[in-house]
Amino acid sequence: MIYARIAGTGSFLPGEPITNDDLVARGIDTSDQWIIERTGIRSRHLASAEMSSSDLAKTASERALDAAGVRPDDIDLIIVATSTPDCIFPSTAALLQSKLGIRNGAAAFDVQAVCSGFVYGLTIAEKFIRSGSHKRALVVGAEVFSRILDWSDRGTCVLFGDGAGAVVLEAAEAPGILASALHADGSHHPILCVPGAVAAGQVVGDPFLRMDGQAVFKFAVRVLGDVALEVLDQAGVTVDSVDWLIPHQANIRILQATARRLGVSMDKVITTVDHHGNTSAASIPLALDLAVRDGRIRPGHRFIIEGVGGGFTWGAALLQF
């Protein structure tokens, strides 16, 4: 039986931290207290104008490859989860492949499930590996959400940051992914979306992120609890056997509400939203890499990753490191 396991993790945050006070100094009608009380966010990172999602992904990927002890040409599958691709086409995954110097014909494609994207990408990669068609995958979440924010809308622009996280997933004799579940319900698309599009060389409609925060909160807490319980049930284990919970880092209130529903202490929740903001598809692999490198997540530990994002999409996976 072929299984899949994480062999290495990596991440990258562009530039210096941008504090809430820095945003106020830039003219945004908000305050440090207002942002912290509602979101738990104290700072975030924003990419410079010349940096793209594939640039962020490249550095995160190089760090994951180094941690796994493999060369770029050892990768035979590249999946990039992003809602802020470098261009309409080719895929950001193909551009990343070129930047990493991978010339072996590895398959490369993007996944667009917004903040659930990394869970989707990891689950897809695991299926490829377990089928025997591929042996080693590079799965990346990379975003430059600062490009799609309306900086006059203080209800959204203060929430997001830019960054990338990556894992190397490889074939193994013992399971590293114990269970997974993916879901979507497109009827909820109006509560979190970028409604605009490009047509005939013009931007048609609204090109900025729009969100109904209260509706998103209620939906997110419900489905994050449900999908975590779903993967636990699939694996035949209880939440008490899980060492860590790594949710999508949307805001601290969603993390706290999800932990309460699952009966998990916040001490077991990997939290980065305070210093990263919401980095969409990058948030889970960023948090995972941080926890691996600081020694919290160690070999043998079990953890749940889970995300919810525009679409609406949601998903979770139970892993053993």
Swiss-Prot record:
Stretches for region ACP-binding: 249-253
Annotated pathway: Lipid metabolism; fatty acid biosynthesis
Location of this chain's protein in the cell: Cytoplasm
MF terms (GO), sorted A to Z: 3-oxoacyl-[acyl-carrier-protein] synthase activity; beta-ketoacyl-acyl-carrier-protein synthase III activity
Chief location bin: cytoplasm
Keyword annotations from UniProtKB, A to Z: Acyltransferase, Cytoplasm, Fatty acid biosynthesis, Fatty acid metabolism, Lipid biosynthesis, Lipid metabolism, Multifunctional enzyme, Transferase
Any GO BP: fatty acid biosynthetic process
Catalytic reactions of this protein: malonyl-[ACP] + acetyl-CoA + H(+) = 3-oxobutanoyl-[ACP] + CO2 + CoA
This protein's GO CC annotations: cytoplasm
Active site, UniProt feature: 115, 248, 278
Known EC number: 2.3.1.180
InterPro entries named among the record's database cross-references: ACP_syn_III_C (IPR013747), ACP_syn_III_N (IPR013751), FabH (IPR004655), Thiolase-like (IPR016039)
Taxonomy, superkingdom: Bacteria
Task performed by this protein: Catalyzes the condensation reaction of fatty acid synthesis by the addition to an acyl acceptor of two carbons from malonyl-ACP. Catalyzes the first condensation reaction which initiates fatty acid synthesis and may therefore play a role in governing the total rate of fatty acid production. Possesses both acetoacetyl-ACP synthase and acetyl transacylase activities. Its substrate specificity determines the biosynthesis of branched-chain and/or straight-chain of fatty acids.
UniProt cross-references to NCBIfam families, sorted A to Z: fabH, PRK09352.1
Subunit structure and binding partners: Homodimer.
Family statement drawn from the similarity comment of this UniProt entry: Belongs to the thiolase-like superfamily. FabH family.
Domain text: The last Arg residue of the ACP-binding site is essential for the weak association between ACP/AcpP and FabH.
Protein name: Beta-ketoacyl-[acyl-carrier-protein] synthase III
